[in-house]
Amino acid sequence: MRAVVVVTGLVVVVVTTTLSLQDHDVKSASSPLSSSVDQGSSGDDCDEGLPPPDQPFRVVWNHPDNCEKINLHLPLDEYGIIFNKRRVFLGEEIQTLYDTGPWPYINKTGCFINGGLPQLFNQPDNSETCKILGKNRIEDFTGLGVLDFETWRAIYSTNFGTMENYQIESVNLVRKRHPDYSEKELKMVAEQEWQEAARKIMTDKLAAGQSLMPRGYWGYYLYPRTWDSKPDTKFRNNKIDWLWRQSTGLYPSIYIYYDVVSKTDSVITKFVSDTVGEAVRVQNDFSPPNTPIYPYVMFQTMDNVFHKEDHMKISLGLSAKMGAAGVILWGSSQNYKDFTTQCSRLQ
């Protein structure tokens, strides 16, 4: 039996699901770092792995709440919710890292920062990333290490919409060198160059975290994710198998973005099932042994509207049933602009 804690507004609901060892697709091993990784150091092997599959589903708190500073106590421990000591955002249980050193990107005005494109990024070593990550280094860290970079995507073809400039400029970069190439040839070379450059940047960043805190469970927020259809999702995610082979944690997002009254249970169930299901597939096909899945979950909108209790039960309960090791309850600093009010509502 697993007790799944669902936090929704002032109510904490315990959803009980029956799970046996066979319910889990998590591979057993002594360490999530026991197999080799691509393009980076995984650090020393260790004897300590995840709890056995029949251990409680873990709910991890990742909110910048500051509630204790105003003497408002959130009794997370009473409900088995795991949190960093002193409620720091970067702590011993979880670190969601937004600053991991320089990244190439195109800003809102079209300026190329740090080269703009991964292909033009010129960083001879990982020293700056190691320096920044080292500021939050915790000796014997065995928590969740999550790198969060969302300005462009690792898979070339998924840089569409507001990210389309990355495809356009990648093609232009090839055209400057090969003006005689056909449009098809330009796009083919642009994609190849993008994938190679993005791979080096992302694996180097991941390796920096793994070398500094080798017993942590390292991966990228939003990876893996789903796309238009299951075949399309599988095809695209298989292109970055190098990322799954190096990651020792998988951190997809099952955030529900919507007017809280507008989505049906079936729509949310399909979304959660597809997203967690793809993470399980990636885990089975590529991941090092004992790599955990921790979907990111929000229990309120950016407008501070709490999600429906039934929808939270779906998000957490289905994640547990499908084999995730736990979930991460994430909260935005935007929700805490008036943290006195927010803390009172949570309490």
Swiss-Prot record:
It catalyses: Random hydrolysis of (1->4)-linkages between N-acetyl-beta-D-glucosamine and D-glucuronate residues in hyaluronate. Its main location: secreted. It is an enzyme of class 3 (hydrolase). Disulfide bonds join C67-C343. Residues 27-49 are annotated as: Disordered. GO terms for cellular component: extracellular region. Keywords: Disulfide bond, Glycoprotein, Glycosidase, Hydrolase, Secreted, Signal. Residues 19-33 form a propeptide. Its EC number is 3.2.1.35. The active site is at E150 (proton donor). Expressed by the venom duct. Residues 1-18 form the signal peptide. The keyword Disulfide bond applies. It is found in: Secreted. GO terms for molecular function: hyalurononglucosaminidase activity. The keyword Disulfide bond applies. GO terms for biological process: carbohydrate metabolic process; hyaluronan catabolic process. InterPro entries: Aldolase_TIM, Glycoside_hydrolase_SF, Hyaluronidase. Contains 4 disulfide bonds. Is N-linked glycosylated at three positions. Residues 28-43 have a biased composition (Low complexity). Belongs to the glycosyl hydrolase 56 family. Hyaluronidase catalyzes the hydrolysis of hyaluronic acid (HA), an anionic, nonsulfated glycosaminoglycan distributed widely throughout connective, epithelial, and neural tissues. In venom, they are known to enhance diffusion of the venom by degrading the extracellular matrix. This is Hyaluronidase conohyal-ad1.
